[in-house]
């Protein structure tokens, strides 16, 4: 839906924020769009498995910066999330080295229990070319103080709420 490329990991498997503190899948992740449709085609799964290993290479950041040289927008994680802190460091470096590109990062890793991730994601959010969105665990319109983005039922008409129908 966004007019840009994205870099993804496997939904649920590589989303440690998709589980609550007891290890149960949070409501929003129980209906995750990235667990059906084109996301479950063999080539799509193969690409996400490749990405899971590829980011560990020393050349990853330099090559990613090169690939984004002509891009205006980029989305991190239409599936998956920043599972590893070292990956977060590399993503931050890519963002810093591509000021011409607007990065969008939806994430569940801003939960207080992921302290190291929170610190580096907050650094990302300070960059003028980065938009970080804390993805809600809820599907009933409730959200915590950490963010203001959530999933709501279609029949919900709360005053002051902007609905994105993407």
Where are each of the predicted segments found?
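Class I S-adenosyl-L-methionine
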Residues: 1-166
């Amino acid at each position: 839906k966004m007019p840009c490329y994205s870099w993804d990991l496997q939904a649920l498997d590589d989303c440690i924020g998709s589980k609550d503190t007891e290890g149960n899948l949070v409501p929003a992740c129980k209906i995750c769009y990235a667990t059906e449709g084109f996301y479950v085609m063999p080539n799509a799964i193969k690409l996400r498995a490749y990405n899971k290993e590829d980011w560990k290479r020393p050349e990853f950041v330099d090559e990613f910066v090169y690939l984004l040289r002509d891009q205006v927008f980029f989305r991190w994680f239409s599936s998956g999330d920043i599972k590893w802190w070292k990956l977060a460091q590399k993503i931050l470096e890519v963002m810093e080295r591509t000021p011409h590109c607007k990065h969008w990062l939806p994430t569940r890793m801003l939960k207080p229990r992921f302290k190291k991730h929170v610190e580096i994601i907050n650094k990302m959010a300070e960059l003028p070319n980065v938009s970080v969105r804390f993805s809600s665990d809820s599907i009933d319109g409730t959200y915590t103080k950490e963010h203001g983005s959530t999933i709501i039922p279609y029949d919900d008409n709360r005053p002051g709420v902007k609905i994105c129908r993407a």
